[in-house]
């Protein structure tokens, strides 16, 4: 787990301010959802947190250390998966160990036994152990995103960032993938920040919420604080009739059968498939 301190963060691109005076602190183990319309600054904020984008002014600290570039202890899940479609789910997951081994060793699967086990455990966590040898390009969008989650887990991060991880998925697959992200965060004790624009999903899986508008943080609170008035402030006058509240939004569920074409394998992430051919 990691704690994050963001202080007076500002990022501009020419005359355009993507982030303005953003400050907050995330505690160890929190599952935080960043809400906001497209262009609100969510992606820029996450890229500053993982060191992919350098802020114009202000600072980001993880466990008290300034973020000055990409860090091995920060895993990232992208909207467009960023997986290699010609490779199998297993090989894609194994590539998460690149921060500990060379590209050549990873491509030829010359990884040590523990790294191979890490990849299999990660695929098990997201319900894809039985599909380890399936080529990623033949998988559904939801399954591909789950491969991306497994790759991030193999990186062995303390902090997990997810940038609109379900934006391109249908509602059922989106709920499934968010369930796996929440389950992975719980099992691996990860501090997690996920940007979303689906309020229902945010309320279902989020513990804390940061609302952004025009590059600024306009809300920071918990589920009971995320009222319809707050949602209107973040998104404008949207239809709130279908937004779930109360008990309907409190199910932190990782489904055992996925709507995106995959099913959970038997056993948990600590299961060691000692006879698995990937370990030879």
UniProtKB/Swiss-Prot annotation:
Residues 4-239 form the ABC transporter domain. Residues 246-280 are annotated as: Disordered. It holds the Pfam family ABC_tran. Belongs to the ABC transporter superfamily. Phosphonates importer (TC 3.A.1.9.1) family. GO terms for molecular function: ABC-type phosphonate transporter activity; ATP binding; ATP hydrolysis activity. It is found in: Cell membrane. CDD domains: ABC_PhnC_transporter. SUPFAM superfamilies: P-loop containing nucleoside triphosphate hydrolases. Signal peptide: none annotated. It is a peripheral membrane protein. It catalyses: phosphonate(out) + ATP + H2O = phosphonate(in) + ADP + phosphate + H(+). Part of the ABC transporter complex PhnCDE involved in phosphonates import. Responsible for energy coupling to the transport system. ATP binds at residues 36-43. PANTHER family: AMINO ACID IMPORT ATP-BINDING PROTEIN, PHOSPHONATES IMPORT ATP-BINDING PROTEIN PHNC. This is Phosphonates import ATP-binding protein PhnC. Keywords: ATP-binding, Cell membrane, Membrane, Nucleotide-binding, Phosphonate transport, Translocase, Transport. It comes from the Archaea. The keyword Glycoprotein does not apply.
């Amino acid at each position: 787990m990691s704690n994050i301190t963001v202080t007076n963060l500002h990022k501009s691109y020419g005359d355009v301010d993507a982030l303005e005076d953003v400050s907050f602190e995330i505690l160890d183990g929190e599952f935080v959802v960043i809400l906001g319309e497209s262009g609100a600054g969510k992606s820029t904020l996450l890229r500053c947190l993982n060191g992919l984008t350098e802020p114009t002014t202000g600072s980001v600290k993880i466990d008290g250390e300034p973020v000055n570039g990409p860090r091995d202890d920060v895993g990232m899940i992208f909207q467009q998966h960023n997986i290699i479609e010609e490779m199998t789910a297993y090989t894609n997951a194994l590539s998460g160990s690149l921060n500990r081994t060379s590209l050549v060793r990873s491509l030829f699967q010359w990884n040590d036994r523990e790294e191979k086990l890490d990849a299999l455990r990660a695929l098990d966590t997201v319900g894809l152990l039985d599909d380890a040898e399936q080529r990623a390009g033949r998988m559904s969008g939801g399954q591909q995103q789950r491969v991306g989650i497994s790759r991030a887990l193999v990186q062995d991060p303390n902090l997990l960032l997810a940038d609109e991880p379900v934006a391109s998925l249908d509602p059922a697959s989106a709920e499934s993938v968010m369930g796996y992200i929440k389950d992975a965060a719980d099992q691996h004790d990860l501090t997690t920040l996920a940007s979303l624009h689906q309020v229902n999903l945010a309320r279902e899986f989020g513990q804390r919420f940061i609302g952004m508008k025009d590059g600024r943080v306009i809300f920071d609170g918990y589920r009971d604080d995320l009222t319809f008035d707050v949602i209107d402030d973040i998104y404008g006058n949207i239809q709130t009739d279908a937004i779930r509240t109360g008990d309907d939004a409190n199910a932190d569920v990782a489904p055992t059968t996925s709507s995106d074409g995959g099913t959970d394998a038997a056993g948990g992430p600590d299961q060691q498939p000692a006879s698995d051919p990937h370990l030879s």
